[in-house]
């Protein structure tokens, strides 16, 4: 099977030095042989909002692609659970449309088996007073690419993301989060944490972009990375862009290993270093 084609994903909105290899990611893909699994559309309204929406998807053998569209009506409080898995190469593109004062609690579990690849693209557009609270967990042993783009279009709209991952073996984990602030008094909070062991590789790109007109808006992002192997590779790219004066943007990262005091605590209780790292 020809996999010489490359898809460019997880792009930074503004490019940085090419030699850092963080401007985007490329994934091998055979467009001609990709199975189109169609589009599923959902409408969450006042009548059905009490029942959480469950979306469980497994990719087909080889290359496959799926589209999801979710419309959340004005004033509705929606909950969506998504579980994505594959033994091949699977691309899932999900678009959320939130109307005035709608809220969405989104829980995503992204998984891929050995030698498999999952690309999950999640877009959200928030009207005035609308908001998304996303929890995303990246697990499994295959390569995982998570691409998240949120438009805070309306005043007082908001977005929060809690992202967790565990990289192991020779796995690649590549996460991109872009939040575009358009409306006034908009807020976002991005909190990412995870651990890398063996020879795992991880890239996290977090972009908060304050557009003209987004005055009195606030954006915060942070990442915590635990390094559990000499061969792991970690790249963290926090980015704050600003075209508006009266805004607040903060970013930070904590990257380190288990300290000697913690290891001594475990070893004094008969727990080896390897067991402590797994804990």
Model-derived regions, located:
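Conserved beta-strand/loop scaffold segments within soluble protein domains that form the structured core
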Residues: 30-271
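Catalytic-core signal marking the mid-to-C-terminal active-site face
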Residues: 277-279
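Long, low-complexity, mixed-charge
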Residues: 1-50
């Amino acid at each position: 099977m020809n996999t010489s084609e490359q898809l460019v994903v997880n792009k930074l909105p503004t490019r940085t030095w090419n030699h850092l290899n963080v401007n985007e990611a490329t994934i091998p893909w055979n467009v001609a042989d990709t199975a189109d699994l169609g589009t599923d559309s959902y409408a969450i309204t006042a009548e059905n909002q009490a029942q959480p929406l469950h979306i469980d998807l497994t990719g087909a053998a080889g290359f496959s692609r799926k589209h999801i569209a979710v419309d959340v009506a004005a004033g509705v409080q929606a909950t969506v659970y998504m579980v994505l898995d594959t033994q091949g190469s699977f691309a899932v593109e999900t678009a959320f449309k939130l109307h005035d004062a709608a809220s969405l609690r989104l829980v995503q579990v992204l998984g891929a088996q050995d030698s498999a690849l999952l690309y999950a693209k999640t877009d959200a557009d928030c009207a005035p007073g609308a908001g998304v609270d996303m929890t995303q967990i990246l697990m499994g042993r295959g390569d995982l690419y998570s691409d998240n783009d949120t438009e805070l279009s309306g005043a007082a709209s908001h977005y929060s993301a809690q992202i967790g991952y565990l990289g192991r073996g020779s796995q690649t984990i590549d996460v991109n989060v872009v939040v575009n602030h358009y409306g006034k008094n908009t807020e976002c909070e991005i909190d990412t944490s995870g651990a890398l062991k063996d020879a795992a590789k991880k890239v996290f790109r977090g972009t908060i972009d304050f557009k003209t007109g987004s005055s009195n808006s606030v954006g915060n992002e942070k990442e915590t990375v635990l390094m559990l192997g000499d061969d792991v590779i970690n790249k963290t790219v926090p980015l704050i862009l600003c075209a508006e004066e009266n805004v607040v943007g903060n970013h930070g990262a904590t990257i380190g290993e288990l300290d000697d005091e913690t290891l001594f605590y475990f070893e004094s209780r008969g727990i080896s270093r390897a067991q402590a790292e797994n804990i």
